[in-house]
Amino acid sequence: MRKSKEKGRSGSTRPPQLKKPEWVKMRPEEVEELVVSLYRKGYPPSMIGVILRDQYGIPMVKAVTGKSVLQILRERGLAPEIPEDLMNLMKRAIRVRKHLEEHPKDYHSKRGLQLIESKIHRLVKYYKREGILPPDWKYEPSKIALYT
């Protein structure tokens, strides 16, 4: 079983230059307020970008405001403690662990869990190095259920 890195090639192409398109009529402050209100409604940062693209016609938040969605949330003190990609991987690991409790002989899922947890450890190392997670933060599957 390979580490699945080649999946998901489809997706919209990013604009070649980071400039505000002419058709976007919203001011940067309005876009920032939209980002904050969507986050308060419970949408994660990745979904906020998709919603702004699909429903409001804003192709890239950074092109309009000069800041990414996470930068806007950090300025307002709203950014999540644990980065979204890491949280999603941890939720996946919890689901696989729960499955393995019921089906302990499922060796394919055991291997999948190993791959997921390896990816978690690599991400944690990166986030500690970048200062996003505290240096003493540790991935412990038993305690992670409290975060999710």
UniProtKB/Swiss-Prot annotation:
Keyword Ribonucleoprotein: yes
Keyword Ribosomal protein: yes
Gene Ontology molecular-function annotations: small ribosomal subunit rRNA binding; structural constituent of ribosome
Chain intervals for the UniProt region annotation (Disordered): 1-23
A single GO BP: translation
Segments traversing the membrane: none
Keywords recorded for this protein, A-Z: Ribonucleoprotein, Ribosomal protein
SUPFAM superfamilies: S15/NS1 RNA-binding domain
GO CC annotation, single: cytosolic small ribosomal subunit
NCBIfam families from the UniProt entry: PRK08561.1
Family: Belongs to the universal ribosomal protein uS15 family.
Oligomeric and partner information: Part of the 30S ribosomal subunit.
The protein, known as: Small ribosomal subunit protein uS15
Native source species: Thermofilum pendens (strain DSM 2475 / Hrk 5)
Gene that this polypeptide is encoded by: rps15
